[in-house]
Design a protein with these regions (language model features):
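Short, charged, low-hydrophobicity "junction" segments
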Residues: 43-51, 412-415
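Active-site-proximal flexible loops/turns
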Residues: 9, 66, 259-261
Length: 513
C-alpha cells in the first residue's frame, strides 16, 4: 500500500527522465552538411563561392550566384571502420550503407526592381543529410576485474527495497512500468538488478536501503556490442538576392529532424563463486535507446565580390532548437547457482517501451568566414573558418524549465565542452568539360579534453563532367577521429578507445531546369 500512495503522488508532479548525457547531446545535434559530390570533394568549402545546391546549406547567399534554375540529386555509399581497444582486447568492425543523401533545386528570377539594382531573386529548397548514424562496434572475450553488478549497485544504493521490488502476484512488466513511471530511471535499473538476483538487500525490510552483490569478486569474461541506426537531416527553404554586381545576400529557414537508435549488449560470465554459496555466474544485459525529434533554425549569409577574382563570405547560423523524445527497452537474463549447487535461470523481459517526457536541446550558434579566389574558367579555391562554442549547449524541459537533472547535465556540458574551430580548404581545376577537385578539413573537437574526443580530420577528391545542360560528379572522402566510449554511465564505466575511419563515395547529377 505504501508504494500505491507514493505512485499517485509522483504521477501528478514528477517527470520520467532517462539519464541523458553529453554523448547523447552530440549524437542528436550533429549538424555537419553531407552534401553533393562536388560540394564534398572540396571538403564542403564553399562559403564564398556559392553556385552549388549544397552550398546553400553552408551559406544561404550561395543561391544568388546561380544564373539559371538548377536541380541536383546525390547518392552516397558510407563505410565506417572502427578499430576498438578495450582492456587490451582489440577488434575491427566495418559497417556500410547506401542512402540518398541530398536533393534540391533553385529557381532564378532575373531583372527585378524598377531601379534594376536588384539583379535577381532566387528561391531554393533542399534536403541534406547531416549525420549518418549507422555504426557498429564490438569487443569479444575481454577480461575485466569490474562486473556489471557495479552498475546495478550504483543505481540501487540508498533506495528503499519496497520501491524497487514487485508486489506479490505482480508481473515483471507491471512492476517495471509502475516503478519507472513512479520513481524514475535509477529505481527501474535497481529493480532489474534485484529481481534478477544480481543484488541482494542487507535486510528484507521495506525500508532497507543498502545492497550487496551475488556476483563473487574476481575476474570476468565480457563481450560488448554497440549497434546504431538512423539519420539526422536538414530541410532548407532559401531566398537569395543579388544587389548590383558585387553583393549577394541570403536567408535560410531550416527544419531539422533526428532519428537515432542505439542497441547495446553486455554478456558476462565468471567462475569466481565458492561451493555452498549463492553465485550469479552469467549475465546478459540488453538496452535499446531510440531518440527522435525535430528542430528549427535560421541562417543569414552574404558574399561580396571585392574584385573580379576575390570574394569574401560570412554566415551566421542560429542555434537549433530541438524537441526530442526518447524511448527505451531493456532485457536482462541471469544464471545462478544456489547453496545446494542447483542451477536457475532468471529472465526479465518486460516487453515494455518506456516513453519519456519530451525535452528540448538548444545547440550552439556558429559563425563562419570565407575567402575565395576565382580564376575565371580555369578554377577556384576557397577557405572557410568556423567557430562554435559547444559549452553553451543547453537542455531544458518541454516547458522551458531547467530542473535538477538538466541543471546537472548543463553544468557538465559547460565544464567538459569547449569552443570548436573548423578549417576547410577546397580547390577545383577546370579543363574543357572536365573538373578536378580536392579538399582538406579539420573539425575541432567539442571536448576540452581532446583525449576524450579528438579533432576530426580528412581529405577529399573528386571529378566532374559537364554536358550541355547537366553535370555528373563523383567524390571520394576519408575522415578519421578517435574517441572514448563509456560502457555505462554508472558502475561499469570502463572506456573503449575507438579509432574511427569514415569512407564516403558519392555520385551526383545536376541539371538545368
Amino acid at each position: 500500500m505504501n508504494r500505491i500512495i507514493i505512485t499517485i503522488f509522483f504521477y501528478l508532479v514528477s517527470l520520467s527522465l532517462i539519464s541523458q548525457n553529453i554523448t547523447d547531446a552530440l549524437n542528436y545535434t550533429n549538424n555537419n552538411i553531407d552534401g553533393s559530390a562536388r560540394f564534398s570533394s572540396m571538403a564542403g568549402s564553399f562559403g564564398a563561392l556559392g553556385g552549388e545546391i549544397s552550398s546553400i546549406s553552408a551559406n544561404p547567399a550561395g543561391s544568388a550566384i546561380f544564373n539559371d534554375s538548377y536541380f541536383s540529386l546525390s547518392f552516397a555509399s558510407d563505410k565506417k571502420s572502427n578499430d576498438v581497444n578495450l582492456l587490451n582486447a582489440n577488434n575491427t568492425q566495418d559497417k556500410s550503407n547506401l542512402s540518398m543523401n541530398q536533393i534540391g533545386g533553385v529557381f532564378v528570377f532575373n531583372n527585378i526592381g524598377a531601379a534594376k539594382k536588384w539583379k535577381k531573386i532566387v528561391l531554393g529548397i533542399s534536403y541534406d543529410q547531416t549525420n549518418n548514424n549507422f555504426n557498429e562496434f564490438f569487443v569479444r572475450d575481454f577480461t575485466n576485474s569490474n562486473s556489471i553488478d557495479s552498475y546495478f549497485l550504483a543505481n540501487a544504493q540508498g533506495l528503499r527495497l519496497d520501491q524497487i521490488s514487485a508486489f506479490d502476484n505482480e508481473t515483471i512488466t507491471d512492476a517495471y512500468v509502475d516503478i519507472g513511471n513512479t520513481f524514475g530511471y535509477p529505481h527501474q535499473q535497481a529493480f532489474l538488478g534485484y529481481e534478477s538476483w544480481i543484488i541482494e538487500p542487507d535486510s528484507f525490510e521495506d525500508n532497507n536501503t543498502s545492497y550487496t552483490s551475488n556476483i563473487a569478486p574476481g575476474t570476468f569474461n565480457q563481450t560488448y556490442y554497440s549497434i546504431s541506426r538512423g539519420y539526422n537531416g536538414k530541410l532548407t527553404a532559401n531566398i537569395g538576392a543579388q544587389y548590383s554586381e558585387k553583393i549577394y545576400l541570403g536567408l535560410n529557414v531550416n527544419g531539422h529532424f533526428v532519428d537515432y537508435d542505439n542497441y547495446n549488449i553486455l554478456e558476462e560470465s565468471n567462475s569466481n563463486g565458492q561451493e555452498g554459496s549463492l553465485n550469479v555466474t552469467d549475465v546478459n544485459f540488453e538496452n535499446r535507446l531510440s531518440g527522435f525529434g525535430s528542430g528549427f533554425s535560421i541562417q543569414l549569409g552574404a558574399i561580396a565580390k571585392l574584385t573580379d577574382w576575390l570574394r569574401l563570405g560570412i554566415v551566421y547560423d542560429s542555434p537549433v532548437w530541438y524537441e526530442i523524445t526518447e524511448e527505451t527497452r531493456q532485457y536482462l537474463a541471469t544464471r545462478r547457482i544456489d547453496q545446494l549447487g542447483e542451477e536457475f535461470t532468471e529472465v526479465l523481459n518486460p516487453n515494455a517501451i518506456n516513453v519519456y517526457d519530451a525535452f528540448t536541446i538548444q545547440t550552439p550558434s556558429k559563425i563562419t568566414g570565407s575567402l575565395a579566389i576565382v580564376l575565371n574558367k580555369f578554377g577556384l579555391i576557397n577557405f572557410d573558418y568556423s567557430r562554435k562554442d559547444y559549452s553553451s549547449m543547453e537542455f531544458r524541459t518541454i516547458d522551458g524549465y531547467e530542473d535538477t537533472h538538466f541543471s546537472d547535465l548543463n553544468w557538465a556540458i559547460y565544464n567538459n565542452l569547449t569552443v570548436a574551430n573548423s578549417y576547410k580548404i577546397g580547390a577545383e581545376i577546370r579543363s574543357n568539360a572536365m573538373s578536378y577537385r580536392a579538399g582538406y578539413r579539420i573539425d575541432g573537437s567539442p571536448y576540452a579534453d581532446t583525449d576524450q574526443y579528438s579533432d576530426r580530420t580528412g581529405f577529399s577528391l573528386g571529378i566532374g563532367y559537364k554536358f550541355k545542360s547537366s553535370t555528373i560528379d563523383l567524390s571520394f572522402e576519408k575522415y578519421n577521429k578517435q574517441f572514448n566510449h563509456h560502457l555505462y554511465d554508472a558502475g561499469l564505466t570502463n572506456q573503449a578507445l575507438i579509432d574511427n575511419d569514415n569512407t564516403i563515395i558519392k555520385l551526383s547529377i545536376t541539371s538545368i531546369m
